[in-house]
Amino acid sequence: MGDNLKKRSSMTTDGDNRAPNRAMLRAVGFTDEDFHKPMIGIASTWSEITPCNIHINKLAEKVKEGVREAGGVPQIYGTITVSDGIMMGHEGMHFSLPSREVIADSIEIVSNAMRHDGVIAIGGCDKNMPGCLMALCRIDAPSIFVYGGTILPGNCDGQDVDIVSIFEAVGKFNAGKISREEFIRIEQNAIPGAGSCGGMYTANTMSSAIEALGMSLPGSASMPAVSSRKANDCYEAGKALINLIQKGITPKQILTKKAFENAITVVLVLGGSTNAVLHLIAIAKEIGVGLTLDDFDRISKKTPHLADLKPGGKYAMTDLDKVGGVHGVMKYLLKEGMLHGDCLTVTGKTIAENLKDMPDLVPNQTIVRKKSEALHPSGPLVILKGNLAPDGAVAKISGLKKISITGPAKVFESEDDCFNAIMTDKIKPGDVIIIRYEGPKGGPGMREMLAVTSALVGKGLGEDVGLMTDGRFSGGTHGLVVGHISPEAFDGGPIAIVQNGDKVTIDSSKNLLQVEISQEEIDKRLKSWKPIEPRYKTGVLAKYVKLVQSATNGAITNLL
């Protein structure tokens, strides 16, 4: 180990003119020897506000041990997190997607300011993963992402339960399908401890995508948060980063177009969240890779859905981990010719080299099917276009018996109005709900609609109504739902001029989203449309509205 690995930090520590800088570093524990070692930033998203992140600092300490062992000098620093589960269904959800940008900005600021020679970012809750990756792309020093890990399932009356169980219980209780006592028991047992929400929801979707991208160590994505394996994953990541610095490998060499195609394939096979579309496009833009909705559409049409995972399926991430994990799935996909095996990873080796000596999926398991027995012959994430979404929209069809609907529009100007209508039985089978002015600018922040969709499922309407929005959906959502409609209502997209009673069609089999009125009538209504005032005039959300781009561009705020 030598000064030649200090390509960035040398400007902070080397030479007589940097004596004041070194004096400050001595006060935080640096020794004479440390000034000759690469400086490593460890970005921790630890927080007491959410179970997804409450254990992260313990993991950061294990990363620190690995860095020290391999000859680096580690520095743990903090960034923010919010809790999507706790923010869901109220005003706080406006801040979820903007938190992704703050995470990215803050990691970029600290590690570029300190001139860290390498960075390890540790994330737990949903926006941590893309926020961390976006920052690592901007810094483009040798980097690794470590996932905090998935939560263990809760147990209620002998049944596995999780965060979606209690969201759906709200609708069931309102409909009189469960007693108050059962409702309370589900609440008390749904979240047993540390870790991210346990199905193939957004956090686990993004951890899987990041492993497929090659930016985390093999096996990292599916390990439980509370396990010796996860602690060792962190320790090994610390050591692996020094190897990356020695080899001079940075995210720009790893995050190629083929790497993103691998990530999309894995997300589709696993039945991942619609949020993966938004976040992968955002990450790709940060690293300079051209990724669009058309890429998702192209790959989805040839990629089968194989994993029977929640929310549309039966199993949790811990179940997948027991039968071989995400790396086991990737090994199967590589054998089937569905992945680019020559993509470089943070081990310094290729995907194919990493998977060569890793175990196959457990024989005769029922969680991940073979291609010949696919749950669906194409991917569950569907890109729709039409006169309601000229720039595109995203639907998820996993676990659905019905993938199309035509019915009268029930229009709401916010999520809150729609939720109240559901809970007061104003939504009927056959309706197509439209929730607008919830886009990146209009919301602002593209609120997730888990409270709404879970209420529909709890009320028994999940298969009988359609729902479309310029907002987003939680990874825990299931039902005939379409999000990310672009252009959004705030920008004068056609969703802004739909009226109650208009006949509206969602047809996932034809990739179609349209209102059954003439183009002449659409143009007439658009001419008389007037934009709404931004809902926030001061503070971070007011700033966000001025910077954020459309969902088709990943809702990024970087000035690219």
Swiss-Prot record:
One of its GO terms (biological process) is L-valine biosynthetic process. The active site is at S474. Disulfide bonds: none annotated. Pathway: Amino-acid biosynthesis; L-isoleucine biosynthesis; L-isoleucine from 2-oxobutanoate: step 3/4; Amino-acid biosynthesis; L-valine biosynthesis; L-valine from pyruvate: step 3/4. InterPro entries: DHAD_IlvD/Edd, Dihydro-acid_dehy_C, DihydroxyA_deHydtase, DiOHA_6PGluconate_deHydtase_CS, ILV_EDD_C, ILV_EDD_N, IlvD/EDD_N. The keyword Magnesium applies. Residues 1-20 are annotated as: Disordered. Keywords: 2Fe-2S, Amino-acid biosynthesis, Branched-chain amino acid biosynthesis, Iron, Iron-sulfur, Lyase, Magnesium, Metal-binding. It is an enzyme of class 4 (lyase). [2Fe-2S] cluster binds at C52, C125, C197. Binds 1 [2Fe-2S] cluster per subunit. This cluster acts as a Lewis acid cofactor. The modification N6-carboxylysine is found at K127. GO terms for molecular function: 2 iron, 2 sulfur cluster binding; dihydroxy-acid dehydratase activity; magnesium ion binding. Pfam families: ILV_EDD_C, ILVD_EDD_N. Its EC number is 4.2.1.9. Its cofactor is [2Fe-2S] cluster; Mg(2+). Mg(2+) binds at D84, D126, K127, E448. The keyword Metal-binding applies. Belongs to the IlvD/Edd family. Homodimer. This is Dihydroxy-acid dehydratase. It comes from Leptospira interrogans serogroup Icterohaemorrhagiae serovar Lai (strain 56601). The gene is ilvD.
